[in-house]
Amino acid sequence: MEEYQKKIKEKLNVVPLEPGCYLMKDRNDQVIYVGKAKRLRNRLRSYFTGAHDAKTTRLVGEIRNFEFIVTSSETESLLLELNLIKQYQPRYNILLKDDKSYPFIKITKEKHPRLLVTRTVKKNSGKYFGPYPNAYSAQETKKLLDRIYPFRKCDNMPDKLCLYYHIGQCMGPCVYDVDLEKYAQMTKEITDFLNGEDKTILNHLEERMNKASEQLDFEQAKEYRDMIQHIHNLTKKQKIMSSDNTIRDVFGYSVSKGWMCVQVFFVRQGNMIKRDATMIPIQQTEEEEFYTFIGQFYSLNQHLIPKEVHVPKNLDKDIIQSVVDTKIVQPVRGAKKDMINLANHNAEVQLDNKFELIARDESRTIKAIEELGERMGIQTPIRIEAFDNSNIQGVDPVSAMVTFVDGKPHKKDYRKYKIKTVEGPDDYKSMREVVRRRYTRVLNEGLPLPDLIIVDGGKGHMNGVMDVLENELGLDIPVAGLQKNDKHQTSELLYGASAEIVPLKKNSQAFYLLHRIQDEVHRFAITFHRQTRQKTGLKSVLDDIDGIGTKRKTSLLRTFGSIKKMKEASFDELRQAGLPEKVAKNLQNALQNK
């Protein structure tokens, strides 16, 4: 039994049978999972006994220590769990800070308010309405309101009247004193309209349409008629879910094979305008997973808390109330209960449709890294960092690093490097510099170390990297090299001090993963190098010499590698590089005078 396993076993004996939260830590003392439990000892022991699904097995395999915090109640545990997840952002927790941002219409909280479409919700900065099903829907509604209510349009107050004032869509607060009561009245009418009360705005438009008709301004009357029709269309587009206009979110969920799907219906003005589905691998009871989910849904994500939240009857209303500060409803009959049933059914369908794909993808990527670890004789490389260099004969040399976690790209940990200490095209020294910079910073900042480092290259690259890691930084991390064939395709994985070929079948999941990693790091490095070249434009003394354009400049740099080497070249060597006599003389004179 490993030493850490003995310590964990001893520690489990003193964990109390009380509610609380626990923090699982890896070999780098990083928190990788936060959970809660009614009885801490039972929950923690369950991780280290019996069989688990693939995800929990991987989690347990990484645990080297744990901590726990006792709380006075299950509700307090939930609140603490949410705060700990925010603080540590563990990778095995379901963090709902994703890219599911929806558009809202906002009335700013300013002396002279503005009407905006935004995907960012900030507390105490104004009134928000939505979410809208898409940006087009929100923008069309805003355009309609802009034509009726002359709110300020400018971000900053200008010192003169703008076009919007002259077309009647602004009251010109930059120049004139505007009655603030007028703004208050407009804000109320817009609020009523966006909350489903459209009678006032329809009456205004009908009055304007009739007045325009009486004045024989039929073009203007038609415009008002179209606006009225647009409002009617807005209220008819979505399926009617309720006869009242209360702003509510309706939650349902389904559980199958260790996964939970939570379905949310956004109901506005009696219509279901949007729905959201989230897949969650279950680490706790289904009720506990739901409490964690709904707490994160409103605290970590940009979701407005509605006037009502509807949830299934089997859940503890008081626990949900502790993390969602609004009215919690658990319908037992009628149309509102039907909405809960519909959300549950949609969650079940979503789970059935996607579970097989998720399981297949999970199996494929996990199988790939497990196979890779077995073939190399190392522990399963959960975290892989790969490096590649890019330059044109030493010009604007750069390097890039990509990170794969659980066999998938982890793009927030990608890094770009400009080579600082190497002159000319020297791949080995460039790789040494970048690896030295990367892992010096990792050590200084306590960042997670990789389980495997891959370099795009052979034995020379590998030896240089291992020398830096072992002899300069004192690190023992497996280093492998990826080589390509004549067609520039991934062909071999090299490993060990003698850079031996690791036997991998070309059709294996492990080989496919390596191919993907090599392509990704190459793409990332090439893109960065291209961006760097575009910024510098290969600016040099060559730009000012008659007879040397972009093509000749690039050709010279490829031939000689640097301006310094060109300066050391003889006249004949410059001529042999393809320069006409006059141009070669111009270049030599320019470089000698430099």
UniProtKB/Swiss-Prot annotation:
Q: Which family does it belong to?
A: Belongs to the UvrC family.
UVR domain span: 199-234
Q: Name one GO biological process term.
A: nucleotide-excision repair
- The principal location of this protein is cytoplasm
Pfam families, alphabetized: GIY-YIG, HHH_5, UVR, UvrC_RNaseH, UvrC_RNaseH_dom
Q: Where in the cell is it found?
A: Cytoplasm
- Identify a single GO molecular function assigned to this protein: excinuclease ABC activity
Please report the organism this UniProt entry assigns to the protein: Staphylococcus epidermidis (strain ATCC 35984 / DSM 28319 / BCRC 17069 / CCUG 31568 / BM 3577 / RP62A)
Known partners and oligomeric status: Interacts with UvrB in an incision complex.
Q: Where does the GIY-YIG domain lie?
A: 17-94
* Highest taxon of the lineage: Bacteria
Task: Print the keywords alphabetically.
Answer: Cytoplasm, DNA damage, DNA excision, DNA repair, Excision nuclease, SOS response
Q: What is this protein called?
A: UvrABC system protein C
Q: What does this protein do?
A: The UvrABC repair system catalyzes the recognition and processing of DNA lesions. UvrC both incises the 5' and 3' sides of the lesion. The N-terminal half is responsible for the 3' incision and the C-terminal half is responsible for the 5' incision.
Keyword DNA repair applies: yes
Under NCBIfam families, the record lists: uvrC
Q: Name one GO cellular component term.
A: excinuclease repair complex
